[in-house]
Each structure stands twice: as C-alpha cells, then as structure tokens.
C-alpha cells in the first residue's frame, strides 16, 4: 500500500485549523479523512481503519485524552497509531499523551515538516 492509499484521520474541531492541515497533508500526497470530536474519531477509526490519526486533545463531546484511552481498549483499533496535537508544550503534557496511548506528540502551532516526519515514522513502524 502506498502512502497515497493510506488514510490519515485528522481529528480537529477548529474548522480553520482543520482545513489548513487537510490542504497541507493533501499537497504532501496523503489521503485525509476528518472528524470534529473524540466520539466521531472513534467511529471513524472503526469504520475507516486509518493508517495514522492526528488527534487534537481539546475536543468537544469527548476530548482527545479520553478518545485515545478508549481506542487503546478497543482491539479493532488499538494498533492504529495516534499522534497527539495540542497547544500544551510542557514535558508533562507529552508524558500525559503517551500515557493515554498516543504514539507521538506534536505541539500547536504545528511545525509541518516535523509533523510529516512524525507521520512517516508511524507509517514506517506500523506498515
């Protein structure tokens, strides 16, 4: 499966941020699906089996922390790597994301080249 055939699920409730990231990911050759909250993210993960999930942590309905923990407890999606996206840049926030089951962590505003490197690392590690 090529990178262009693998779906990246972007979970972001801010429409401006979501649209900007979708455009940039598509320009980088990725197929992108979106969800606007943690509950919708879990549903999309089960239905679409994305290669990687980019998950904002501050989401309505169900926050990213909770969605990550629940994904880890669901055998059908537990192996899907999740990269946490958050404005919280403290080391304890990174530790919290990893404890919740995230595979990696990126801060906002997003350093796009760094994010692409993190995505590539997860794709290589899991496929």
Language-model-detected regions and their locations in the chain:
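Conserved acidic carboxylate
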Residues: 12
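C-terminal output helix
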Residues: 22, 110-119
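The feature encodes the CheY-like receiver
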Residues: 60-61, 78, 90, 109
């Amino acid at each position: 499966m090529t990178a262009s055939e693998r779906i990246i699920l972007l979970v972001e409730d801010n429409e401006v941020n979501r649209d900007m990231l979708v455009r940039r990911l598509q320009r980088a050759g990725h197929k992108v699906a979106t969800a606007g909250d943690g509950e919708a993210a879990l549903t999309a993960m089960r239905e679409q089996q994305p290669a990687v999930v980019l998950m904002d942590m501050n989401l309505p309905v169900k926050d990213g922390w909770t969605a990550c923990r629940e994904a880890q407890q669901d055998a059908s999606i537990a192996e899907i790597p999740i990269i946490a996206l958050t404005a919280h840049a403290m080391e304890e926030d990174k530790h919290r994301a990893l404890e919740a089951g995230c595979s990696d962590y990126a801060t906002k505003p997003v350093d796009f080249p760094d994010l692409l490197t993190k995505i590539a690392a997860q794709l290589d590690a899991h496929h």
